[in-house]
């Protein structure tokens, strides 16, 4: 795990399973209809139960650039923040959607008083973007929201290649190498 400190906030890149992270909230790179079929959304639904999708669908449609929050069902995370990267399931997306979704998720987490949030590669996978690109967009969103996002943002990579891509994207966005992480962060991943 590598960390970048922005004021009193920490942005981390970690390898793991988003459905097992013990952050207060996890982010679902949703579609505007809130259908949780494939990718990270499908994994969150399978692990946390259909109640997550049912709650989210009651709030649909949600445009790209906005986010909604639901319970975490039976996930270790208390909440799921649904931030659409696409209008309909299975769409290829432009890079700006990864930024808009990341920004919306972090802004909502801050407004809800959430202290720790875990995010997958928003827009990679089903959306068709590279992990490095979407990690750069997430880091840029955090940088713009400086001081107005949760204490911990954890970008969760599935596998070594995705981890390297996330690390590269964050490094490009922030212009510095990541370093050691606070000891209390390890309990979340």
From Swiss-Prot:
Gene3D superfamilies: Leucine Aminopeptidase, subunit E, domain 1. Residues 1-174 form the Macro domain. It comes from the Archaea. Disulfide bonds: none annotated. InterPro entries: Macro_dom, Macro_dom-like. SMART domains: A1pp. This is Uncharacterized protein APE_1648.1. It comes from Aeropyrum pernix (strain ATCC 700893 / DSM 11879 / JCM 9820 / NBRC 100138 / K1).
């Amino acid at each position: 795990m590598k960390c970048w400190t922005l004021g009193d906030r920490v942005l981390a890149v970690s390898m793991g399973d988003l459905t097992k992270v013990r952050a207060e909230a996890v982010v679902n790179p949703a579609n505007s209809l809130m259908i949780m079929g494939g990718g990270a959304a499908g994994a969150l639904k399978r692990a946390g139960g259909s109640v997550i999708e049912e709650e989210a669908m009651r709030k649909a449609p949600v445009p790209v650039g906005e986010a909604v929050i639901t319970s975490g069902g039976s996930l270790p995370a208390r909440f799921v923040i649904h931030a659409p990267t696409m209008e309909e399931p299975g769409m290829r997306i432009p890079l700006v959607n990864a930024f808009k979704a990341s920004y919306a998720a972090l802004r909502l987490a801050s407004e809800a008083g959430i202290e720790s949030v875990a995010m997958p590669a928003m827009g990679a996978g089903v959306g068709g973007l590279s992990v490095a690109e979407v990690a750069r967009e997430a880091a840029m969103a955090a940088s713009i929201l400086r001081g107005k996002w949760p204490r911990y943002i954890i970008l969760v990579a599935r596998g070594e290649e995705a981890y390297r891509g996330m690390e590269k994207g964050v490094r490009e966005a922030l212009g510095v190498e990541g370093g050691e992480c606070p000891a209390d962060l390890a309990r979340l991943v």
